[in-house]
From Swiss-Prot:
Described purpose of this protein according to its UniProt entry: Exhibits S-adenosyl-L-methionine-dependent methyltransferase activity.
Record keyword S-adenosyl-L-methionine present: yes
Binding site for S-adenosyl-L-methionine: 127, 156-157
Recorded GO MF terms: methyltransferase activity
EC code(s) of this entry: 2.1.1.-
Species: Mycobacterium ulcerans (strain Agy99)
An individual GO BP term: methylation
Keyword annotations of the record: Methyltransferase, S-adenosyl-L-methionine, Transferase
One Pfam family cited in the UniProt record for this chain: LCM
Protein's name in the database: Putative S-adenosyl-L-methionine-dependent methyltransferase MUL_0817
Length: 300
């Protein structure tokens, strides 16, 4: 595959879009069986509709992910920790009175359809036009219903997405809950800063943002990227992490948010496993995600 360019685009079966489908397949796998760790009943049908056969086989259980020393249980726990963190973030924001939610780079995220949103909540989703069109059309064909006020927006986050958001009725005078899940490494370093600058500009006090933080902002280059690529290849996916991410020095999330008007709380990868009642992550999970924190910022 080719290295990223500033004008590239994708659908759920290609490039960065395929990684979103892979995450959906992980949610589907963790939602299977009597010991399911998640309840995302739409993830599996979406993955089937995309049609990437290695991922279809994975959710069907027809092929094991040959990924020692990580067990299937460890892999399911990892995606459960991540998914629950952002689910709980939105649930708490709604309980606290926030009535605007924005899912940035939503991919095959189904929260607009499966979370119990409070009355009056408006949920915006932003992603590539092909991704938004595929998901909304496919879920409509399945008969899935989103929350009553669901406003998907097809635009690249490297473009003027704040204007597109306002055009769909976003009210910058009201507190908002934002998530940027699994997104930042796919943005150029300057676009990451611009993303958080735009979020800050659109956020009144009491607004909240949730994302992930790595103490080494270039942590997904080098050995981590190689490990992920090897895992994907064993699954039958022709993806190379080093070709999908943007390289170069970037600001650390916690410091950038703290320096730009947010009160920040971070919970480590290991802490969140314990919070969910899981055993400590195994060595392979730590090699991939050790040092990572889940971060919430509250606008001052």
């Amino acid at each position: 595959m080719n290295r990223r360019t500033d004008a590239d685009s994708w659908d759920p079966a290609s490039s960065v879009g395929a990684t979103a489908t892979m995450v959906a397949a992980s949610r589907a796998r963790a939602s299977r069986g009597p010991d399911a760790l998640l309840d995302d009943r739409l993830a599996g049908p979406l993955v089937r509709a995309v049609g990437l056969q290695p991922l279809v086989r994975m959710i069907d259980g027809d092929t094991a992910v040959d990924d020692p020393p990580s067990s299937p249980r460890s892999l399911n726990e990892q995606i459960a920790v991540r998914t629950r963190y952002f689910d709980d973030f939105f649930t708490a924001a709604g309980a606290g009175g926030i009535r605007q939610a924005v899912i940035l780079a939503s991919g095959l995220d189904t929260r607009a359809y499966r979370l119990n949103w409070p009355s009056g909540m408006t949920v915006y989703e932003i992603d590539q036009p092909q991704v938004i069109e595929f998901k909304t059309r496919t879920l409509a064909e399945f008969g899935a219903l989103p929350c009553p006020d669901h406003r998907p927006i097809g635009i690249d986050l490297r473009e003027d997405w704040p204007s597109a958001l306002r055009q769909r009725g976003f009210d910058a005078g009201q507190p908002t809950a934002w998530i940027a899940e699994g997104l930042l490494v796919y943005l150029p370093p300057e676009a990451q800063d611009r993303l958080f600058d735009n979020i800050a500009e659109l956020s009144t006090p009491r607004s909240q943002v949730a994302t992930e933080h790595f103490p080494d902002p270039n942590g997904f280059s080098g050995p981590r990227a190689q490990r992920l690529s090897e895992r994907w290849h064993r699954m039958g996916m022709d993806l190379d992490m080093a070709e999908l991410i943007y390289h170069g020095d970037r600001n650390t999330v916690i410091d950038y948010l703290a320096d730009h008007g947010w009160r920040v709380r971070a919970r480590t990868f290991e802490e969140m496993h314990a919070h969910n009642g899981f055993e400590p992550p195994d060595d392979e999970m730590m090699a991939l995600f050790g040092g990572m924190s889940y971060v919430t910022g509250i606008r001052k």
